[in-house]
Amino acid sequence: MTRAWFTACLLLALTITGTSSNAAGATKAASGPDAVLGIWVPDAAPRQLLTVERKPPPLNAAAAKLYAARKRQFAAGDRSYDPTTWCAGPGMPRAMTMPVAFEIRRDGNHLAFIHGWYRWFRAVDLGGPDVNDPPLPLTMGFPVGRWEGDTLVIRTVGLTDATVMDANGLPHSDLLVLTERLRVLPDGRLEDRMTVEDPDTFTRPWETMLTFHRDATARVPDDVCPDRLAAGEPAEPPVATRREAAPPPPAIQAVPSAAPAPRLTGIWEPKTFGFMVTGAPLSKAGQEIVDRNAAAMAGGRIMQTAWVSCRPGAVSTMTMPREKIVILQSPDEITLLFEMPRMVRRIRMNATHPATLKPGYVGDSVGRWEGGTLVVDTIGFNGFAELDARGQPTSPQLHTVERFTPAADGSIDIEVTITDPEYYEQPFTIKRSWKKSASRHPFEYDCMENPRQEDFENAYYVRERYRPVCMRVEGEGMTLSKMVCGKPEE
């Protein structure tokens, strides 16, 4: 842990929520329900949640004892009670207390919070009744929203008790019901007033409040937590979204359309799923990698790819998407939220690629409509992704062109043309298809939830980057298992 990071955390570790001073750059409040949409930056990143009366939460005796022990751990520099320290999901309301920007987007009855920490998002159903009997507990639960005038009310149930509510480790049970009331204040800030109900943890319901402000320079990054841990950086970064904001993307160039674009909005799922991409015209270099991977697996080794190491690139969502995909569509951006692998892809419509790009896992995607087909061109990959479970490689030269065409049966037919001269002799095309899902919510995929030591004892790493940073080590006798993090070489 660096001294600079520690100092930043001390500045952020405010123990009182809901600061009331006006944030720099605050804008006048917009009107209507959609005033809550956009990118927001926390006014403070509270280490400890307090009630709106600035008092400690009304914990019962057992929960108070546990919370006190966790605060002592925090003071001693041990945060192993917090899953975010090994890049597992933050849960709620922990995600809203983190010192990173987030964006609220809406398309019809589909609303999403896109968080700036490790690709987490919340998909909120605005069109149905409350969920009262969740099928299983999830990291982000099952949020259902509604509008009360200009206030967005979100009720979330089904939150797993494996997460904590604040950085000090405030506990909760899986009976937690969290009701948020989000509204834009007259000074332009966003207020999130939360009612907490959990009879197994608290003696009564209580309220807390967080506030956020807009910042024209803020961006929601494509954050990859394991990469930061591997570099010796903290899992929870200090507020850097303003100081180190990326330059804005190129201005969108309006292109007149002869007919309205098809609507892709909704929740989708693959018609079929396969772990293999067949018939790829591998170059000599590509074939050598595939043969080396095959030999390792034939020898009984377990292959660790980018997907398995929780670093899946956008190309993985093109070739091997699993489970649900949420699509939010607007004239200037189409946003794809993938359940597995968990990822947010942004397609900037009628735009151009920047002249210079910092390579990343998701690349830079620009789209256009050709009649009823959405054409997406993506470059700027970092080369740390595989096409399939055999480890067919990609390089930074990877260039993909996707064509999404609505079919007569209501599904979406997809063609993906892949060009990568380092590993493939010529461009080739694969076909996929998505169908409408009956689900109201995606189930999140928390890849880093429980990496166990035995999972890596006979591992073969396609790339050194994929070595684990954190793993759960089983204790002996009465010693409980614990999560241990360190640099991959350790």
Predicted regions: what is each one?
Residues 24-490:
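PEST-like low-complexity, intrinsically disordered acidic/proline/serine-rich tracts
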Residues 7-18:
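Bacterial N-terminal signal peptides
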Residues 1-4:
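Positively charged n-region of N-terminal signal peptides that target proteins for export
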